[in-house]
From Swiss-Prot:
Protein name: Ankyrin repeat, SAM and basic leucine zipper domain-containing protein 1
Biological process according to GO: cell differentiation; male meiotic nuclear division; regulatory ncRNA-mediated gene silencing; spermatogenesis; transposable element silencing
Principal place of residence: cytoplasm
InterPro entries linked: Ankyrin_rpt, Ankyrin_rpt-contain_sf, Asz1_SAM, SAM, SAM/pointed_sf
Placement of ANK repeats on the sequence: 45-74, 78-107, 110-144, 148-177, 181-210, 214-243
Assembly, per entry: Interacts with DDX4, PIWIL1, RANBP9 and TDRD1.
Pfam families documented for this protein: Ank_2, Ank_4, SAM_2
Annotated keywords: ANK repeat, Cytoplasm, Developmental protein, Differentiation, Meiosis, Phosphoprotein, Repeat, RNA-mediated gene silencing, Spermatogenesis
Modified residue annotations for Phosphoserine: 17-18, 20
Function: Plays a central role during spermatogenesis by repressing transposable elements and preventing their mobilization, which is essential for the germline integrity. Acts via the piRNA metabolic process, which mediates the repression of transposable elements during meiosis by forming complexes composed of piRNAs and Piwi proteins and governs the methylation and subsequent repression of transposons. Its association with pi-bodies suggests a participation in the primary piRNAs metabolic process.
Biased composition (Low complexity): 1-10
Stretches the record annotates as Disordered: 1-23
PROSITE patterns on file: ANK_REP_REGION, ANK_REPEAT
Length: 475
């Protein structure tokens, strides 16, 4: 990091703030004239100069001060060491210099380790990754937790750093450890909406069924935080990615997960990890990664893929086996559309409870489908007007329709509340009605048992007959 590049105050990583807004660090630029020592300095002045050199990222001055005898593990106000500060701002060169001078990579302050501080640093993932790699090379333990029982991998997952997650696991980090609230790294990634991290954790063997203390699994956490794409992906029962990398050695895992770009490209990239889009995540979840290039060549989006017919699959070169995987996944995610002409008329007294419950369930599913559709539109809508390629009508038209839509949603909410109150009223009246006879539990009689057995026998015979007929036809 260049001298003077930092202006912000360093705080403890992972949301664990220090005891004061002023951690003893003076933020700002150091006068060029004072960057070289002009003779021996008193200890207090030397410490102050050391802090300023760390703050501005002045590597040469830091080295000069260390050469003059100042301790590399100096404890500043509130217990932070120079290495902890350098890690908190992801200053790779400063971290390297301090480690080479003997700084303790395993230091912690109130269970806030330097590795945790690095994983929760603010900066580019590439810089954070290099800092973490340096600390791990000096035997920093990736499984030491903070006061909230959060480990480095949880902080990396929470902040959306898939490469850092992969590196930590390659050095022995536990994927499925839980914090004080029962959150795993996967839960944190799902909560924050980091789909790349979710995908990587599943590949590394993360358990998507581990519950938090309030009984929620990662998919439910994602849904609660309106990350419906991740919710749908985690809800798929088929997960061929799970544990794909668990059998590899440490060296093989690092090589596979951290393939870097050429030196010329490193300075221009946020990371060397490929960002996955909606289509890639869907295909990875089904083990259909080989289809990615084919679909991209034909400009087929995820939305188009999900609405394809049988003949379109074949026309686009998708074989029957892959078609079946896609259709099976769609069936799991399918939201049944309501045909209002077929809905029961609530006014009829002979309507059954099952029919009415089915109506409410369908209505609820349809609302969820509408929410997902609107969220997808919000995600894909250009933020800046200059990114719109085709000419649009006046935005006022869209705004007015949205206002009408909001009014309709409010009206729907009001009517549903009325329906809920009415059902509650009917339930209370029924419970207080002295003439109401509660439903008796169904008692299995001798006749009913015979009837059930007869029905099972008939069904079994019919199935056997069907198999025989099918065999004859094939011959």
């Amino acid at each position: 990091m260049a001298a003077g590049a930092l202006r912000g105050l360093a705080v403890a990583g992972g949301g664990e703030s220090s005891e004061s807004e002023d951690d003893g660090w003076e933020i700002g630029y150091l006068d060029r004239a004072s960057q070289k020592l002009k003779g021996p300095l008193p200890i207090e002045e030397k410490n102050e100069t050391f802090k300023k050199a760390l703050t501005t990222g002045d590597i040469s001055l830091v080295q000069e001060l260390l050469d003059s005898g100042i301790s590399v593990d100096s404890s500043f106000r509130y217990g932070w060491t120079p290495l902890m500060y350098a890690a908190s701002v992801a200053n790779v060169e400063l971290v390297r210099v301090l480690l080479d001078r003997g700084a303790n990579a395993s230091f912690d302050k109130d269970k806030q380790t330097i590795l945790i501080t690095a994983c929760s640093a603010r900066g580019l993932e590439e810089q954070i990754l290099k800092c973490v790699e340096l600390l791990l090379s000096r035997n920093a333990d990736p499984n030491v937790a903070c006061r909230r029982l959060m480990t480095p991998i949880m902080y990396a997952a929470r902040d959306g750093h898939p490469q850092v997650v992969a590196l930590l696991v390659a050095h022995g980090a536990e994927v499925n450890t839980q914090d004080e609230n029962g959150y795993t790294a996967l839960t944190w990634a799902a909560r924050q909406g980091h789909k790349n991290v979710v995908l990587k954790l599943l590949e590394l063997g993360a358990n998507k069924m581990l519950q938090t203390k309030d009984g929620k699994i990662p998919s439910e956490i994602a849904k609660r935080n309106k990350h419906l794409e991740i919710f749908n992906f985690l809800s798929l029962t088929l997960n061929p990615l799970e544990g794909n990398l668990q059998q590899l050695t440490k060296e093989e895992t690092i090589c596979k997960l951290l393939t870097t770009e050429s030196d010329k490209e490193k300075d221009h990239l946020f990371s060397s990890y490929t960002a996955f889009g909606d289509l890639e995540i869907f295909l990875h979840g089904l083990g259909l990664e080989h289809m990615t290039d084919l679909l991209k060549e034909k400009d087929i989006t995820l939305r188009h893929l999900l609405t394809m017919r049988k003949d379109e699959f074949t026309k686009n070169g998708i074989n029957d086996k892959d078609q079946q995987k896609i259709l099976s996944a769609l069936k799991e995610l399918e939201v049944e559309e309501i045909k209002f002409g077929e809905l029961p008329e609530v006014a009829k007294l002979e309507i059954s409870g099952d029919e009415f419950l089915n109506f409410l369930l369908k209505l609820n599913k349809q609302c969820g489908h509408l929410i997902t559709a609107v969220q997808n539109i919000i995600t894909e809508l250009p933020v800046n007007s200059h990114k719109i390629v085709l000419e649009w009508a006046s935005p006022r038209n869209f705004t007015s329709v949205c206002e009408e839509l909001v009014n309709n949603v409010e009206d729907l909410s009001e009517e549903v509340c009325k329906l809920k109150d009415l059902i509650q009223k009917l339930q209370n009246e029924r419970e207080n009605d002295p003439t109401h006879i509660p439903l008796m539990e169904e008692v299995s009689t001798w006749n009913s048992r015979i009837l059930k057995r007869t029905a099972i026998a008939v069904c079994g015979f019919g199935f056997l007959l069907f198999i025989c007929k099918l065999t004859v036809q094939r011959k």
